[in-house]
C-alpha cells in the first residue's frame, strides 16, 4: 500500500507493507527504482494502523527511515528485506525492529543466530509452509509474519496451512496477504 490514498481505504485494525527508496534526495514509497511516489513523511503522518512492514528497497537508507518512524511515533513496525550487513551491525547495537527471513530456501540456522537480537522472523512460503516440530521451537522465539500462499498464486493452500498450524499449535502475529482487507 504505497499511497496515502490507498492507505485511507484500509481499516485501522490492519497493517500495511510499504516499499521505501530514495528519489531526488527524498524518501518515497515506490516498488521500482526511478519512479515518483508519495513522500514517506506524508504517509507516516497519516498512519494510525496495525503493524507497518517497511520493505527497504535501497541499501543505505535504513537509519534515515528509522529516524522518520521515530519522528512520527510509529512503534509497531519492522524492516523487511534489508541487506544482511545492516541486520548484523544494527542488531549488535540493540536495534530489534527488523526481520530475518526463513523459508524452504533460507536456513533456520541463520534465524537461530538472531534469537534475542531481533524481534521478527519473516516466514515465506515460496512453494510450501516450511514449519516442522524442530524449527517451530526456534520460530516461537520471535514475532512471526507469515507470507500467505495467495501471494504466490496458491490461495487453495490457505486452509491447509491453517489446519497444519493448528495441529502444530503454531500461531503467527501477522500475515502478508494479497488482499487489502
Regions found by a protein language model. Give the residues of each.
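Phosphate-group recognition and catalysis centered on beta-loop-alpha active-site segments
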Residues: 1-181
